[in-house]
């Protein structure tokens, strides 16, 4: 699941550099919403990294490719372009030619950016383990006197396929 999502993310970044980044992102999101969201909402919903599978063909899904790319994009946004590049460079240097796993990739991101490895890996693995599409609610409070807008974001996840909701970072 790591290489599939990472490859799609890199392809999306390349396409954005070649064309209009905004147009490319809008197209990617439209595809995600019309195709992958339907998979997540249906009876075949599964995590980006399923705990088990009946056959390897079950790994060729929009969730693994497209949602996996969105996790890579979140890491890119969280760490910044330079931080993500440092983490990627560390990952390729450390694990070139090996059968690396998601934990190795996340560990590289943490090490290269001076973050607590255990906490970082634990937090980000949640995105790989839980099926379904998170719902984010926004509450805004405008304080006229200080002209300050406070946003409170709340993320919820419904139980899917017998799994319990798990708080996501």
Give the residues covered by each predicted segment.
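Hydrophobic alpha-helical and helix-loop surface patches within well-folded domains
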Residues: 1-146, 151
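Short amphipathic, basic-aromatic surface patches that mediate peripheral association
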Residues: 153-165
């Amino acid at each position: 699941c790591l290489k599939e999502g990472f490859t799609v993310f890199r392809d999306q970044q390349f396409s954005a550099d070649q064309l209009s980044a905004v147009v490319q992102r809008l197209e990617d999101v439209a595809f995600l919403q019309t195709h992958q969201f339907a998979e997540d909402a249906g009876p075949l919903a599964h995590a980006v990294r399923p705990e088990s599978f009946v056959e390897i063909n079950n790994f060729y899904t929009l969730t693994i490719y497209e949602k996996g790319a969105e996790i890579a994009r979140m890491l890119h946004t969280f760490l910044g372009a330079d931080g993500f590049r440092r983490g990627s460079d560390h990952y390729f240097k450390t694990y070139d030619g090996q059968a690396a796993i998601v934990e190795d990739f996340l560990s590289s991101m943490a090490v290269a950016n001076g973050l607590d490895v255990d906490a970082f890996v634990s937090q980000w693995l949640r995105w790989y383990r839980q099926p379904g599409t998170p719902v984010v609610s926004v509450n805004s409070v405008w304080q006229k006197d200080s002209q300050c807008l406070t946003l409170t974001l709340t993320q919820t996840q419904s139980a899917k396929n017998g799994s319990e909701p798990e708080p996501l970072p």
